[in-house]
Amino acid sequence: VHYELTRKIAEGGMGLVYEATQKGIGGFRKVVAIKLIREEYSAIEEFRNNFIGEAKLVADLIHTNIVQTYHLGKIGEQYFMTMEFVTGWNLEEFLDRHVETEQYIPADLAVFIVSRICRGLGYAHRKKDSQGRLLGIVHRDVNPKNIMIAQEGDVKLTDFGIAKALDLMYNKEGDVIAGKDEYLS
């Protein structure tokens, strides 16, 4: 199996996300998203541990309203995660498009989008580990950029990078408030 990067689709302070083609034997091909830690952060143990923690945390979150993670890998010193590719828009792009065209989003569509995100969050929060212990996953960064709307109408939550689930992730609890100011509550 190898990956061919097609184009950059998102960029954040600590990482990049690319559309890519996964290639395998017999002409197998699948479009995926690949999330990379920025090279300058790959050398920092805390960032590596958090990236690996995110992959472990979301590996078993299999729900229609959560972007699925397929694989955690490393090439040289560069860590990457392969994820489901969603053909569509993030909610911020969707909202911006409606503002540009001076159109309102119908109330029933807004309720539908929020209800699907709540389903994904509820599933993550109720998820149990292999011993039946509640993980209590809290996303901590729900915002329009982390909500995908597929062309087919599916709504999916992505980027569990600062999520917290008991002690699965490396985290200096109490040292930092995680999330974006506009969306903290």
Question: Model regions: which residues?
Answer:
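AlphaC helix of the eukaryotic protein kinase fold
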Residues: R38-D60
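Conserved N-lobe ATP-binding subsite of Hanks-type protein kinase domains
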Residues: L16
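Protein kinase catalytic-loop region centered on the HRD/HxD motif
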Residues: R119-I137
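Activation segment signature within eukaryotic-like protein kinase domains
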Residues: I113-V114
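Activation-segment/catalytic-loop signature of the eukaryotic protein kinase fold
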Residues: L72
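Conserved short submotifs of the Hanks-type protein kinase catalytic core
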Residues: G76-N90, F94
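AlphaC helix of the protein kinase catalytic domain
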Residues: L91-I105
